[in-house]
């Protein structure tokens, strides 16, 4: 049996996925079953766009349920070590881009809970890969997608 990929995540991320799964199973799935039932009542299924749309939606919901169940089954909860001197998954890192003094902060999380719009970056991102394992006041080179790089200085870890 091959090794199954684990999904590192914070406890908060795990709980968020559990809520999402519950919503899919108890709200979204029954809603789409009802849509299918109503669409069937329209008669001929061969030319019934409402039925086709509802079946497609059902497929997406079932895929999401399977994906989330898989991630939860193979979740690796990253415990907070309490060490705010080293960057690790679950920590929020504040840094300044050098030269300069404008601060940016991101929480490093597992890919399953990454949400850049809310300041959560995946541990698999170039930024996080460059920061993980580094310490307070370290200067770090971060590769950019265009082949360049930026230099940042870590000013806070929490």
From Swiss-Prot:
GO biological process, one term: regulation of DNA-templated transcription elongation
Pfam families (alphabetical): GreA_GreB (PF01272), GreA_GreB_N (PF03449)
Coiled-coil intervals, chain numbering: 2-70
Role summary: Necessary for efficient RNA polymerase transcription elongation past template-encoded arresting sites. The arresting sites in DNA have the property of trapping a certain fraction of elongating RNA polymerases that pass through, resulting in locked ternary complexes. Cleavage of the nascent transcript by cleavage factors such as GreA or GreB allows the resumption of elongation from the new 3'terminus. GreA releases sequences of 2 to 3 nucleotides.
Domain of life the protein comes from: Bacteria
InterPro entries: GreA/GreB_C_sf (IPR036953), TF_GreA/GreB_CS (IPR018151), Tscrpt_elong_fac_GreA (IPR006359), Tscrpt_elong_fac_GreA/B (IPR028624), Tscrpt_elong_fac_GreA/B_C (IPR001437), Tscrpt_elong_fac_GreA/B_fam (IPR023459), Tscrpt_elong_fac_GreA/B_N (IPR022691), Tscrpt_elong_fac_GreA/B_N_sf (IPR036805)
Record keywords, A-Z: Coiled coil, DNA-binding, Transcription, Transcription regulation
PANTHER family for the chain: TRANSCRIPTION ELONGATION FACTOR GREA
Homology family: Belongs to the GreA/GreB family.
Protein name: Transcription elongation factor GreA
Keyword Cell inner membrane: no
Any one GO molecular function term: DNA binding
